[in-house]
């Protein structure tokens, strides 16, 4: 499986929603989540991609310990949580650190413990509940092959934009 570069914006356990300004590279506090939820894993984006929402593809990285905003990690996709929000399609690729022996047994979304998948799905289903005009629709899980196709499409989308 191919390894990809991602940048973490939000560490596991945070309510702060950080975003990287892609022109300056600076990390900004976008908002504090309106709900009492915390991110269930480190959250960021795939470099050099463009998702359906016009932003780089989102990624949730399962790690032993959280990292801090701005850290780059080589990951391999193992699945995808298919969802949409008020801006359109908003798939969340689920990945693990490439070559970390603690995660080698996770090759596909079904290798992730069921309870962990439920936590991730519950977080994304409810984390915007108190924000006016925002919503999320969960559409289900996809396997590693589907996640890989979405990542490849993200690279192609950015290239088609002339970048």
Swiss-Prot record:
Gene Ontology CC, one term: cytoplasm
Keywords: Cytoplasm, Hydrolase, Magnesium, Metal-binding
Organism this protein belongs to: Leifsonia xyli subsp. xyli (strain CTCB07)
EC number: 3.6.1.1
Location of the active site: 90 (proton acceptor)
Residues binding Mg(2+) 3: 85, 90
Protein name listed in UniProt: Inorganic pyrophosphatase
Organism domain of life: Bacteria
InterPro entries (alphabetical): Pyrophosphatase (IPR008162), Pyrophosphatase_sf (IPR036649)
């Amino acid at each position: 499986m191919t390894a990809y570069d991602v940048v973490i914006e939000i560490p596991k356990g945070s309510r702060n929603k950080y975003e990287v300004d892609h022109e300056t590279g600076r990390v900004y506090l976008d908002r504090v989540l309106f709900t009492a939820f915390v991110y269930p894993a480190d959250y960021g984006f795939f470099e050099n991609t463009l998702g359906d929402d016009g932003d780089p593809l989102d990624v949730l990285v399962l790690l032993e310990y959280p990292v801090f905003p701005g850290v780059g990690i080589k990951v391999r996709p193992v699945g995808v949580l298919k969802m949409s929000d008020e801006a359109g399609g908003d798939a969340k690729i689920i990945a693990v650190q490439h070559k970390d022996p603690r995660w080698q047994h996770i090759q596909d979304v079904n290798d992730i413990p069921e309870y962990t998948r439920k936590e991730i799905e519950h977080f994304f289903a409810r984390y915007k509940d108190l924000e006016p005009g925002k919503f999320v629709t969960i559409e289900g899980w996809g396997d590693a092959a589907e996640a890989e196709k979405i990542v490849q499409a993200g690279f192609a989308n950015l290239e088609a934009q002339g970048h």
